[in-house]
Amino acid sequence: MGYSKETPMESAWRDARIARIYEGTNEINRLVAIGMLIKKAIKGHVDLISEAENVANSLTGIPSFELPDLSDLFDEEKIILKNLKKIFLMLCGAGMKKFGLDIEKEQEVLLSISDIMIEIYLAESAILRTEKNFKKFGKNSQEGQVSMSQLY
């Protein structure tokens, strides 16, 4: 028996193709998002380069050994987010420094930086939404959301 539209294989084949198309679209969007950000930085619309330099300069300085106050909700997570943003800026700066305008041709580099950007967005969105709901609805009703945001 050859290929037949009535067999279960037809829907499995179609679903596999749809998944590949969907994944391809995700890959393209990841490249477009970071590519647009870098283009805006090169044109001077977004101050990415000087921020990356500031992060690089702060790393060469003497670190603070002062323990932060972690008494409020998500204080520790916000410190982690701040450090993730520094990593993102360092990688963008290093990539732009190494490749210059040709960074758009370095898809693997762009995809990795884009993944970090997406993770930062997701983590920050979860924290901000949970904080908003925590203030609006109270502590008891948001225990699950707080735990999920802290876990993320």
Task: Kindly give the residue locations of the regions a language model identified.
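Flavin-dependent oxidoreductase catalytic core characteristic
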Residues: 1-152
